[in-house]
């Protein structure tokens, strides 16, 4: 799906990977670009707008842990531009010391935003179809002992995205669901592995993990922008050490209705 002339929302667009992806997306000649974030960085918003005057950039102060904030922000988008064509769910934290906050931001907030946004995009309701990109992690595909709670949240994102991205739903709504899984990237989130691990026993292996080869946020952001345009329902992509690769998950069981 080309993004030219489209209306795009990026939840968590002022983080490191998110902001790099935002800069890439500004080259796509979108009609409007809505950045939702708890962070308030007016200079970053101005810098985005300066990249392409053809795209109108909006900033919304956003609390992903609040259903009311989610509902109000999405309603505001529809009131301004009528249609939502792409929704990118990129808010996330890594702090295994606070399990509730980890789940509320990484998983529950993403689920609530998707469930609130998808009906607004549904071609059988008030939308015209589109794409939802949920940002999970390579730690949503494989376990990582130093960050067990974070892993659980990202495994949840993967399970939710694969379920709601079933062809049954896509054929009805016209809304594709794609999952993007960054590997270790040079951001403050990566640094948290070394200080906010699951158990005291985790310290040694978390420090070793911190020494793993990483990638630049600019590279990961470019991959994310590419995935947004793919519009491949059910697609799962890994961005790791500078390479973007499609993932085919192992299927152990399928519902009988298929």
Swiss-Prot record:
Pfam families noted in UniProt: adh_short (PF00106)
Residues annotated as binding NAD(+): 9-33
Entry's EC annotation: 1.1.1.1
Group of enzyme by EC: oxidoreductase
Residues that, per the record, bind substrate: 137
Keyword Zinc: no
PROSITE patterns: ADH_SHORT
Listed InterPro entries: ADH_Ceratitis-type, NAD(P)-bd_dom_sf, Sc_DH/Rdtase_CS, SDR_fam
Molecular functions per Gene Ontology: alcohol dehydrogenase (NAD+) activity
GO cellular component: cytoplasm
Catalytic activity as recorded in UniProt: a primary alcohol + NAD(+) = an aldehyde + NADH + H(+); a secondary alcohol + NAD(+) = a ketone + NADH + H(+)
PANTHER family: 15-HYDROXYPROSTAGLANDIN DEHYDROGENASE [NAD(+)], ALCOHOL DEHYDROGENASE-RELATED
Subunit structure, interactors included: Homodimer.
Similarity annotation: Belongs to the short-chain dehydrogenases/reductases (SDR) family.
Protein name in the entry: Alcohol dehydrogenase 2
Native species: Ceratitis rosa (Natal fruit fly)
Gene: ADH2
